[in-house]
Swiss-Prot record:
<dbReference type="GO" id="GO:0006364">
    <property type="term" value="P:rRNA processing"/>
</dbReference>
<feature type="region of interest" description="Disordered">
    <location>
        <begin position="192"/>
        <end position="211"/>
    </location>
</feature>
<dbReference type="GO" id="GO:0009561">
    <property type="term" value="P:megagametogenesis"/>
</dbReference>
<dbReference type="GO" id="GO:0032040">
    <property type="term" value="C:small-subunit processome"/>
</dbReference>
<protein>
    <recommendedName>
        <fullName>Probable U3 small nucleolar RNA-associated protein 11</fullName>
    </recommendedName>
</protein>
<comment type="subunit">
    <text>Component of the ribosomal small subunit (SSU) processome.</text>
</comment>
<feature type="region of interest" description="Disordered">
    <location>
        <begin position="1"/>
        <end position="23"/>
    </location>
</feature>
<keyword id="KW-0539">Nucleus</keyword>
<dbReference type="InterPro" id="IPR007144">
    <property type="entry name" value="SSU_processome_Utp11"/>
</dbReference>
<dbReference type="GO" id="GO:0005730">
    <property type="term" value="C:nucleolus"/>
</dbReference>
<feature type="compositionally biased region" description="Basic and acidic residues">
    <location>
        <begin position="12"/>
        <end position="23"/>
    </location>
</feature>
<comment type="function">
    <text>Involved in nucleolar processing of pre-18S ribosomal RNA.</text>
</comment>
<dbReference type="Pfam" id="PF03998">
    <property type="entry name" value="Utp11"/>
</dbReference>
<keyword id="KW-0698">rRNA processing</keyword>
<comment type="similarity">
    <text>Belongs to the UTP11 family.</text>
</comment>
Amino acid sequence: MSSLRNAIPRPAHKERSQPEARKRFGILEKHKDYIIRANAYHKKQETLKILRQKAAFKNPDEFNFKMINSKTVDGRHRPKDEVNKYSAEELMIMKTQDIGYVFQKWQSEKNKIDKLTASLQCTGDQSSRRHVYYAEDREEARELEVQGRSKSDISTVEIPKDIKKKMDRSYRDLEGRKSRAKDLEKLYTDMSMQKELQKKGRKRKLRDDELLNPNGKAVYKWRADRKR
């Protein structure tokens, strides 16, 4: 009997939809969605209740590391000055490691640029390339002219769209890598200069009137030390 009862067609029970006047509010929330939202809300409320209790029963004289690592300024805790946290030798080692990483990334970008340029060098504008041939007589000149026309016809073959899209994507990637390589080169130069300025020895910054070709960049001169 159960199989016969299941064989009787029944109307499909559809989910309630949002009323026409409230359609701008999106899909109507179902009971299971309300359960998830309510559980999340009550969980957050319980967490806030526990935190409020901890704050209420906290001993203000309880030891905290900020008591020795910070000081009070205008009623607020400020971390102590960390200027002398590292020695000069430790700072030099840290900067050297950073410079090495920047140099490695710069060289990696340069290698990728070379590979992309090598793969795209034969897909550029062929019309700008011109070759000059010298013929001995008119007959040879006609042959050279016919060969040039046939080569130009081959070069003007329409490239498929998918290949053209890949080429455009590769050119955009190449331009982006060139920009990143330029930024990394500038960063490496600046970091190398800062590293040299941290070394011992008297130095001074040259003025623009002391330079042959001033370009706005800082130029330093070190005092020559007598070698023993």
